[in-house]
C-alpha cells in the first residue's frame, strides 16, 4: 500500500469529499502508531445515515469504513467501541463531536478495557466449550474451528486487559509486546491457533482459501451479508495486506491474520439456520467446503493436536480469569 508517508487528509481526500458534512477519524492500527504498509486505513465516518461497514480502494490506498452516529461517538454502546473512539485520531472535526467523544471515552478507558476483556474472556470460555463438545462427538472439523475461534477471543481478552485494542493484521506483534515475562500466555494462543503451520506456503494457501470463502458469501444472499458488507475491495484489501506481510517475511503474522478472516467468513456462512456446524458445510452433495479448501484453511489438525491445543489454551484462559478477578 503506497503513499503512507502522505498526510491523512491528502490520502483520504476521496472520503472527505464524498462525506462532506461528516466528521472523519482514523481508528484501528494506523491510528495507534502501527503505520505500516500492511495496515489499511480504518476510517470512522460520523453520519446520520445507517450504513453497513464497507471496504473500498482509491488509487493505491485501501480503507475500511465504519459509519456511526454522533451518539455512538459520545456514548458508545459497547466497551470496545468506547476504546476505539478514545484512541481515534480526528482527520476532520468541524463540530468537535470527535474531540468531545475522545475526551469522554478516554476518561473511562480503564473501565471500558476491563469490561471488554471480561466479555471476550467469557466468549472464549463459551467457544472452548463448543470445541470440547465437538471432540466428544468426534466432530473433529468443528472442534478444530472452535479451538481456533476461542484462541482469538482469548488473545483479544488478553490485549484488552492491558488496555490495548486488538489489531487483527498485527496481532502477533501486539501479543509479543505484552507477553514479556508471560511466555506461556503466548504459547497457549500459538498452540490453540495452530501457528506451527505458519509459513509462506501456509499463508498463501490460507489466503487462497479465504478468498474462496469471500466468493461464496457474495454468491449467497441467504447469509445476510453478500456484496454490501463483503465487497470485492474487502478481498483486495486482505490480499494486499497479506502480500505486504509476506514481503516483509512476517509469515506467522500473515497466517494469524488469515485465521481471523477465515473465522469471520465461516461464521457468515453458518448464519443460515440450516448450517449449524462446520460439518454441515462440508458434507452432502451441496457441500460448500471441500477437502482441498479445508486443508487450505488450515482446518486439518488431528484429534491429538486439537486436544493438546485445547488443554494449553484452557490453562491460560483460567489464569487470565483468575488475574482479572477484583
Per-region residue spans from a language model:
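Internal, well-ordered alpha/beta segment that forms a basic, Gly-enriched binding/recognition surface
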Residues: 70-132
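Conserved nucleotidyltransferase catalytic core and NTase-mimicking acidic/glycine-rich helix/loop elements
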Residues: 116-326
Amino acid at each position: 500500500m503506497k503513499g503512507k508517508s502522505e498526510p491523512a487528509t491528502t490520502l483520504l481526500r476521496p472520503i472527505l469529499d464524498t462525506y462532506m458534512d461528516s466528521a472523519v477519524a482514523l481508528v484501528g492500527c494506523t491510528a495507534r502508531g502501527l503505520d505500516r504498509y500492511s495496515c489499511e486505513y480504518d476510517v470512522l465516518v460520523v453520519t446520520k445515515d445507517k450504513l453497513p461497514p464497507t471496504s473500498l480502494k482509491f488509487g493505491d490506498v485501501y480503507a475500511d469504513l465504519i459509519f456511526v452516529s454522533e451518539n455512538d461517538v459520545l456514548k458508545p454502546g459497547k466497551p470496545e467501541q468506547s476504546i476505539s473512539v478514545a484512541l481515534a485520531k480526528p482527520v476532520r472535526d468541524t463540530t468537535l463531536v470527535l474531540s468531545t467523544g475522545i475526551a469522554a471515552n478516554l476518561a473511562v478507558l480503564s473501565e471500558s478495557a476491563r469490561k471488554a476483556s471480561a466479555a471476550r474472556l467469557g466468549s472464549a470460555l463459551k467457544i472452548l466449550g463448543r470445541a470440547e463438545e465437538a471432540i466428544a462427538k468426534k466432530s473433529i472439523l468443528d472442534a478444530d474451528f472452535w479451538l481456533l475461534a476461542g484462541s482469538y477471543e482469548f488473545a483479544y481478552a488478553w490485549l484488552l486487559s492491558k488496555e490495548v485494542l486488538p489489531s487483527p493484521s498485527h496481532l502477533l506483534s501486539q501479543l509479543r509486546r505484552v507477553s514479556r515475562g508471560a511466555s506461556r500466555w503466548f504459547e497457549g494462543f500459538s498452540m490453540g491457533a495452530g501457528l506451527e503451520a505458519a509459513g509462506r506456503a501456509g499463508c498463501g494457501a490460507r489466503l487462497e482459501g479465504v478468498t474462496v470463502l469471500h466468493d461464496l458469501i457474495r454468491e449467497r444472499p441467504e447469509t445476510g451479508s453478500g456484496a454490501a458488507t463483503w465487497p470485492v475491495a474487502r478481498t483486495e484489501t486482505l490480499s494486499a495486506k497479506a502480500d505486504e506481510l509476506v514481503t516483509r517475511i512476517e509469515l506467522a503474522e500473515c497466517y494469524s491474520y488469515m485465521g481471523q478472516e477465515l473465522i469471520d467468513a465461516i461464521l457468515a456462512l453458518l448464519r443460515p439456520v440450516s448450517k449449524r456446524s462446520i460439518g454441515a458445510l462440508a458434507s452432502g452433495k451441496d457441500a460448500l467446503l471441500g477437502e482441498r479448501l479445508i486443508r487450505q484453511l488450515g482446518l486439518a489438525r488431528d484429534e491429538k493436536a486439537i486436544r493438546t491445543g485445547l488443554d494449553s489454551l484452557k490453562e491460560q484462559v483460567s489464569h487470565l480469569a483468575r488475574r482479572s478477578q477484583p
